[in-house]
């Protein structure tokens, strides 16, 4: 309800103030996608917080007035290594891309696209870091870190091609430059004092090394 009200407010404001209308959306991510993922089911209540399939937000449930011509589009941050179901579910990991290789990212995108049929799907974030540290492994090599810059470019080109092949509306690559202020569980306990983290570039930290342009 809150998300619908915020989009409604934005559309009304733009229409009445500027006499213009643009498509609207909000950013969603994989743990809130509308599909059921059996690899995420955890029956033990004590560790239920690790179940990334408990709640869903479905773009197809939102409806707009005929007076709002541009309409709503679906927007997701999608990374090929998290949550685990994106590379563990058989239908994703067995998907073959146009190079003849198994490609779990493409498999997930096709599933997400079909679940949002009739709605443009924008991949609002995707990418891989070129850090020394690796904070999340993927069975098909799309790790969250542990890549050289050359490997980062290679895998990123595969992800970009996948977005096109799955007929998405487009993709926003994450990201242009490295972000020195980011923290990551892999190294955060060793970055002391924490408030000085932004003053130096930590090559062990995956979150600081998504950029395709180094700032050093």
Where do the protein language model's features map onto the residues?
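Active-site cleft segment of glycoside hydrolase catalytic domains centered on the general acid/base Glu
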Residues: 1-9, 13-14, 28-40
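Sec-exported extracytoplasmic/periplasmic mature domains
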Residues: 11-16, 164-168
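Glycoside hydrolase catalytic-domain groove-lining segments
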Residues: 18, 24, 39-40, 44-141
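Short, solvent-exposed turn/loop segments enriched in Gly/Ser/Thr/Pro and often Arg
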Residues: 28-30, 125-128, 172-180
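Aromatic-rich peripheral "rim/lid" segments of glycoside hydrolase catalytic domains that contact
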Residues: 133, 137-141, 162-169, 173-216
């Amino acid at each position: 309800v809150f998300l619908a009200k915020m989009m409604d407010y934005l559309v009304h404001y733009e229409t009445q103030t500027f006499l213009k209308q643009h498509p609207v959306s909000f950013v969603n991510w994989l743990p809130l996608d509308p599909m059921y993922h059996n690899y995420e089911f955890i029956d033990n209540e004590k560790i239920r917080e690790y179940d990334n399939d408990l709640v869903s937000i479905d773009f197809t449930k939102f409806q707009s007035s005929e007076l709002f011509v541009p309409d709503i589009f679906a927007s997701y941050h999608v990374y090929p290594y998290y949550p685990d179901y994106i590379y563990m579910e058989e239908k994703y990991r067995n998907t073959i891309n146009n190079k003849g290789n198994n490609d779990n990212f493409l498999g997930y995108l096709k599933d997400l696209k079909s679940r949002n049929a009739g709605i443009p799907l924008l991949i609002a974030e995707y990418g891989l870091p070129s850090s020394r540290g690796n904070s999340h492994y993927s069975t098909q090599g799309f790790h969250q870190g542990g890549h050289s810059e050359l490997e980062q470019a290679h895998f990123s080109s595969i992800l970009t091609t996948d977005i096109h092949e799955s007929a998405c509306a487009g993709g926003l690559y994450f990201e242009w430059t490295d972000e020195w202020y980011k923290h990551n569980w892999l190294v955060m306990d060793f970055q002391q004092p924490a408030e000085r983290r932004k003053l130096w570039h930590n090559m062990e930290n995956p979150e600081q090394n998504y950029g395709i342009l180094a700032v050093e």
